[in-house]
Regions:
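PLP-dependent amino-acid enzyme catalytic core
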Residues: 1-138
Length: 138
Protein backbone atom coordinates (compact mmCIF):
# COMPACT_ATOMS: atom_id res chain seq x y z
CA UNK A 1 0.00 0.00 0.00
CA UNK A 2 1.36 3.37 -0.99
CA UNK A 3 0.40 6.59 0.76
CA UNK A 4 0.84 10.02 -0.73
CA UNK A 5 0.32 13.08 1.45
CA UNK A 6 -2.34 15.45 0.15
CA UNK A 7 -0.61 18.79 0.72
CA UNK A 8 -3.68 20.95 -0.07
CA UNK A 9 -5.77 18.92 2.40
CA UNK A 10 -3.05 19.26 5.04
CA UNK A 11 -2.98 23.03 4.54
CA UNK A 12 -6.78 23.21 4.80
CA UNK A 13 -6.71 21.19 8.03
CA UNK A 14 -4.02 23.46 9.44
CA UNK A 15 -6.08 26.56 8.62
CA UNK A 16 -9.12 24.98 10.32
CA UNK A 17 -7.37 24.08 13.57
CA UNK A 18 -4.47 26.52 13.96
CA UNK A 19 -6.27 28.79 16.45
CA UNK A 20 -7.23 25.80 18.61
CA UNK A 21 -3.88 24.10 19.05
CA UNK A 22 -0.37 24.89 20.24
CA UNK A 23 2.53 25.10 17.85
CA UNK A 24 4.65 22.48 19.58
CA UNK A 25 8.44 22.33 19.35
CA UNK A 26 10.57 19.87 17.43
CA UNK A 27 13.60 18.73 19.42
CA UNK A 28 16.76 16.94 18.36
CA UNK A 29 19.39 14.88 20.15
CA UNK A 30 22.97 14.57 18.95
CA UNK A 31 23.48 11.54 21.20
CA UNK A 32 20.48 9.70 19.75
CA UNK A 33 21.43 10.76 16.21
CA UNK A 34 24.83 9.15 16.76
CA UNK A 35 23.27 5.95 18.12
CA UNK A 36 20.79 5.73 15.25
CA UNK A 37 23.22 6.75 12.54
CA UNK A 38 20.76 9.30 11.20
CA UNK A 39 19.14 12.59 12.16
CA UNK A 40 16.14 12.15 14.45
CA UNK A 41 13.47 14.76 15.11
CA UNK A 42 11.04 14.62 18.04
CA UNK A 43 7.74 16.48 17.66
CA UNK A 44 6.65 17.29 21.21
CA UNK A 45 2.92 16.78 20.92
CA UNK A 46 2.89 15.99 24.64
CA UNK A 47 2.89 19.79 25.03
CA UNK A 48 -0.31 20.05 23.01
CA UNK A 49 -3.49 21.54 24.42
CA UNK A 50 -5.39 19.00 26.51
CA UNK A 51 -2.01 17.41 27.09
CA UNK A 52 -2.61 14.85 24.38
CA UNK A 53 -1.14 14.24 20.95
CA UNK A 54 -4.54 13.51 19.40
CA UNK A 55 -5.77 17.11 19.70
CA UNK A 56 -5.02 17.97 16.07
CA UNK A 57 -7.01 15.12 14.56
CA UNK A 58 -9.91 15.51 16.98
CA UNK A 59 -10.23 19.23 16.26
CA UNK A 60 -10.04 18.69 12.52
CA UNK A 61 -12.69 15.95 12.58
CA UNK A 62 -15.08 17.92 14.80
CA UNK A 63 -14.63 21.16 12.87
CA UNK A 64 -15.35 19.31 9.60
CA UNK A 65 -18.78 18.09 10.76
CA UNK A 66 -21.77 19.58 8.96
CA UNK A 67 -24.30 21.38 11.17
CA UNK A 68 -26.82 18.51 11.28
CA UNK A 69 -24.16 16.04 12.37
CA UNK A 70 -22.68 18.48 14.86
CA UNK A 71 -26.04 19.02 16.57
CA UNK A 72 -26.16 15.30 17.38
CA UNK A 73 -22.74 15.57 18.99
CA UNK A 74 -19.88 13.13 18.85
CA UNK A 75 -19.40 9.67 20.36
CA UNK A 76 -16.22 7.71 20.92
CA UNK A 77 -14.77 5.04 23.14
CA UNK A 78 -11.37 5.65 24.63
CA UNK A 79 -9.53 5.15 27.88
CA UNK A 80 -7.74 8.45 27.71
CA UNK A 81 -6.01 10.53 25.06
CA UNK A 82 -8.64 10.47 22.33
CA UNK A 83 -11.39 10.90 24.93
CA UNK A 84 -9.84 14.12 26.25
CA UNK A 85 -9.02 15.43 22.78
CA UNK A 86 -12.53 14.81 21.46
CA UNK A 87 -14.21 16.29 24.54
CA UNK A 88 -12.10 19.44 24.15
CA UNK A 89 -12.77 19.72 20.41
CA UNK A 90 -16.51 19.29 20.98
CA UNK A 91 -16.44 21.96 23.69
CA UNK A 92 -14.71 24.35 21.30
CA UNK A 93 -17.45 23.74 18.74
CA UNK A 94 -20.18 23.93 21.39
CA UNK A 95 -21.53 20.44 20.75
CA UNK A 96 -22.07 17.43 23.03
CA UNK A 97 -19.35 14.81 23.47
CA UNK A 98 -20.41 11.36 24.64
CA UNK A 99 -17.39 9.40 25.78
CA UNK A 100 -17.46 5.68 26.59
CA UNK A 101 -14.62 4.82 28.96
CA UNK A 102 -13.67 1.48 30.48
CA UNK A 103 -14.22 1.29 34.22
CA UNK A 104 -10.47 0.97 34.79
CA UNK A 105 -9.56 4.24 33.01
CA UNK A 106 -6.97 6.40 34.79
CA UNK A 107 -8.55 9.03 37.04
CA UNK A 108 -6.49 11.78 35.42
CA UNK A 109 -8.01 10.93 32.01
CA UNK A 110 -11.54 10.82 33.47
CA UNK A 111 -10.96 14.23 35.06
CA UNK A 112 -9.74 15.67 31.75
CA UNK A 113 -12.87 14.52 29.90
CA UNK A 114 -15.08 15.92 32.65
CA UNK A 115 -13.16 19.22 32.66
CA UNK A 116 -13.97 19.66 28.97
CA UNK A 117 -17.66 18.90 29.54
CA UNK A 118 -17.73 15.40 28.07
CA UNK A 119 -20.47 13.06 29.22
CA UNK A 120 -18.88 9.79 30.32
CA UNK A 121 -20.54 6.39 30.19
CA UNK A 122 -18.48 3.68 31.86
CA UNK A 123 -18.35 0.09 30.65
CA UNK A 124 -16.43 -3.12 31.20
CA UNK A 125 -12.79 -2.92 30.07
CA UNK A 126 -13.12 -5.00 26.90
CA UNK A 127 -13.18 -3.88 23.29
CA UNK A 128 -16.54 -5.58 22.73
CA UNK A 129 -18.09 -3.78 25.72
CA UNK A 130 -16.68 -0.45 24.57
CA UNK A 131 -18.03 -0.86 21.03
CA UNK A 132 -21.45 -2.07 22.21
CA UNK A 133 -21.78 0.76 24.71
CA UNK A 134 -20.77 3.35 22.11
CA UNK A 135 -23.44 2.02 19.74
CA UNK A 136 -26.04 2.31 22.51
CA UNK A 137 -24.97 5.87 23.30
CA UNK A 138 -25.29 6.93 19.65
Amino acid sequence: MKFAADLPAIRQAHARIRDSIHRTPVLTSTCLDDLAGTNLFFKCENFQKAGVFKARGACNAVFLLDEASAKRGVVTHSSGNHAAALARAAALRGIPAHIVMPSNSPQVKIAAVEAYGGTITFCEPTLAAREQTAQRVE
